[in-house]
Amino acid sequence: MLIREGDVNDAQVLAGLLGDLDYPNTPEAIAERIVVMAANPDSRLLVAESEGRAVGFISLHFIPQIALAGEFCRISYLCVSSESRGEGIGQQLLDEAERLAGDRGCDRMEVHSHTRRVRAHVFYARAEYEESPKYLMKKLTPR
C-alpha cells in the first residue's frame, strides 16, 4: 500500500468515492478543488494506492487556534472504496494523517461524522477518537 499526495489525476476516482458517500460530484469539480487544496499550505490530500490504483483518500486541514498555542487538524473526508474496506486502508490513511499532524505540532485531530454513518463512528472509536461536545451547523447560501 502506498500513501501519497493526491493530485488532479485522482479526480475521477475521488469523485466516484465521494459519490458512494452521497456527495455526488463531477471529476472536473473535484479537480478544481484539488488545485485549490494543493495551493493551500494548511491543507493536505492523501491518496491510498494499491496495485497502481487509488482506493481511498483523506483530506486534512490544519487550523490555528486563538486560545491555545499551535494548531489542530480537521479531517474533512476519509473515503475507502467499498471493495477495499476491511483491509486496513482507512487506518493507514488515518495513521499517516496523525503523523503529519503531530509533525506540525497539532494538539488534536477532529472529525465530524453524520449521525447516520454508524460504521464510521465504530472505525473512529477503535482508533481512540472520543465523542466530544455537540457540533452546531447553519447552512449558508454562497454569494
Task: Give, region by region, the residue ranges found by the protein language model.
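Residue-level recognition of the GNAT/N-acetyltransferase active site
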Residues: 63, 81, 85, 114
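Conserved acetyl-CoA-binding loop-helix of GNAT-fold acetyltransferases
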Residues: 77-80, 86-99, 126
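Conserved active-site alpha-helix within GNAT-family acetyltransferase domains
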Residues: 91, 103, 115-133, 138
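Extreme N-terminal starter segment of soluble prokaryotic enzymes
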Residues: 1-3
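Conserved GNAT acetyl-CoA-binding A-motif
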Residues: 94, 101-113
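Residues at alpha-helix boundaries and the short loops/turns that link adjacent helices
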Residues: 20-24, 87, 130
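Acetyl-CoA-dependent GNAT
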Residues: 5-70, 76, 139-141
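Conserved acetyl-CoA binding element of GNAT-fold acetyltransferases
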Residues: 70-82, 134
